[in-house]
A protein has these predicted regions:
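Bacterial N-terminal signal peptides that target proteins for export
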Residues: 1-7
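Hydrophobic h-region of N-terminal signal peptides that target proteins for export
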Residues: 11-21
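A short acidic-to-branched-hydrophobic micro-motif
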Residues: 90-128
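Primary recognition of N-terminal secretory signal peptides and signal-anchoring hydrophobic helices
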Residues: 199-323
Length: 323
């Protein structure tokens, strides 16, 4: 239970933003296990509660984990809108922190996302953490792949990255030896956060992203959900359905698995896995599988080709050509 103190500290910091006597007071309210505050009496980032929730996983999107309220305050999510927005100048930030509990071990998982008014590198960088902590972070991700514009990790339990105006951290708070943690699971969660950042309607990267057009039989599909993550195109599995792919979903509290079938060939993927099972054996994936709005997002080319679908790309246009 005491591991929840990390979230309690976050709540305390949020509380410190309450203006002193004589200034407009911070607005604060609770709803559905969320503690929400808004300091934007003078300035605002223009982000809503829904905008912040869109940057993290839903309460039931991580198999094997449950979004339980903190036993000390009844909250599982803390959202702070427009931090420092009660002052006319200085930094401006909105944040969301959400915690989950592992159903089997009781270990805690926390995802923190912070959105700034300027490129996040002006406020947070690897160097800040390198000199400001007794534990030296290691530059890069667990897999060696480039998550965001800059990333680093601590042991196997924490991954930090920044992208555009956003900083995100995924942290495991273990009740056992940290060496037993799965760093690639932590990283898979982070890739799902980067996907959400890139898809966010408020353009948190500071510029408009070039859309990827997916064509099946010369007709566009999956508009707005097909993007590149560090050079690898990913998309929800449903984008393959127009190519005569049949999807079968098995989702429980502890597992989220989808089987895709086409002409006797099949692919089976699980949420947060780095490999897929096929009718020809297991295949390592270039990017992990992760959930988004009720679907699983996968590396498009690898899955399509395993189902006998040819993939051709020219610029920002990708064509699926069923064989």
């Amino acid at each position: 239970m005491k591991r929840w103190d990390m979230l309690a500290i976050t709540a305390f910091i949020t509380g410190m933003l309450v203006p002193i006597a004589g200034q407009p007071r911070l607005k604060e309210w609770r709803v559905n296990g969320m503690l929400i505050s808004d300091s934007g009496t003078v300035r605002s980032l223009g982000l809503t509660v829904e905008d912040m929730e869109a940057l993290t996983y839903g309460v039931d999107e991580i198999p094997g984990y449950e979004c339980r309220p903190n036993p000390y305050n009844g909250n599982h999510t803390i959202i702070g809108l427009n931090g420092n927005g009660d002052k006319p100048t200085g930094w401006l930030r909105s944040h969301i922190s959400r915690g989950w509990t592992n159903l089997a071990t009781g270990d805690l998982l926390r995802v923190d996302v912070r959105v700034y008014d300027k490129p996040a590198g002006e406020y947070e960088r690897y160097e800040n953490y390198r000199w400001g902590s007794q534990v030296l972070p290691k530059l890069g991700s667990f897999s060696g792949l480039p998550v965001g514009e800059e990333c680093f990790h601590y042991g196997k339990t924490r991954l930090w990255f920044r992208e555009g105006r956003v900083v995100a951290e995924v942290t495991l708070l273990l009740r056992r030896e940290a060496e037993l943690a799965d760093g690639l699971f932590v990283e898979a969660l982070a890739w799902g956060i980067e996907y959400r950042i890139r898809l966010h309607p408020k353009r948190l990267l500071g510029m408009a992203q070039k859309p990827v057009t997916l064509l099946v039989a010369n007709k566009p599909f999956g508009q707005g959900k097909v993007i590149s993550l560090a050079g690898v195109t990913v998309a929800p599995l449903s984008t393959l359905e127009p190519a005569q792919v049949v999807l079968e979903t098995k989702r429980t509290k502890t597992e989220w698995m989808v089987t895709a079938r086409r002409n006797g060939q099949w692919v089976k993927v699980k949420a947060f896995s780095w490999e897929m099972e096929t009718d020809k054996g297991k295949v390592k994936l270039e990017r992990p599988v992760f959930p988004y709005k009720g679907e699983l997002v996968v590396p498009l080319r690898q899955v399509a080709e395993a189902l006998g679908i040819s993939v051709q790309q020219k610029g920002q246009t990708i064509a699926l050509l069923p064989k």
